[in-house]
């Protein structure tokens, strides 16, 4: 029996660098990058609180898009709250997908290993829309600048169904607070409603048209 954390697997990714699969008594099995949990563990609990809040709005979710699928924590919860939904996941790092399948039970998702920006542009061209879009696009603790551009946010809004909801996950500690709040101001100019929700050290920005 392990008393603290046990490293189940370590791999080197050309995108995320060193990725560890960790098992702990407190948080179960999770995927960590640079000491920051990416999938499973506390991340699962953060998204559970967030999606529970969204589920209370009684929105109809037939199609869900997860940008930044990671190891699949969020996709499990989507199935829990909207069992009849069809989920599409986009993840740029195939290593995360592989570990998710091996250790976190990632399944029942249409997986696209590609850049989220390109996927959204492709969805726009084919006129696809989603009822729930989850944007969780960190590489470690870095949020790629291109996903803060107005052009990307406009594209997200266009592929969101009329009564749909999109939630952006931002880290919310130290200097990350200012970054998150600046991003929130951009969203407020593009969406009719932006709700601020704070589970743990994160800011979830829940937006609707």
Identify the function of each model-found stretch.
Residues 35-50:
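Conserved SAM-binding loop and adjacent beta-strand
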Residues 163-170:
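Conserved beta-strand signature within the Rossmann-like core of class I S-adenosyl-L-methionine
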Residues 37-38, 171-175:
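Short histidine/acidic/glycine/proline-rich micro-motifs that form metal-
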Residues 19, 160-161:
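A recognition module on extended beta-rich or small alphabeta surfaces enriched in W/G with H and D/E
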Residues 48, 52-159, 175, 179, ...:
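The AdoMet/dcAdoMet-binding core of the Class I SAM-like
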Residues 5-6, 12-15, 173-209:
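Class I S-adenosyl-L-methionine
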Residues 1-29:
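N-terminal auxiliary segments of SAM/dcSAM-dependent transferases
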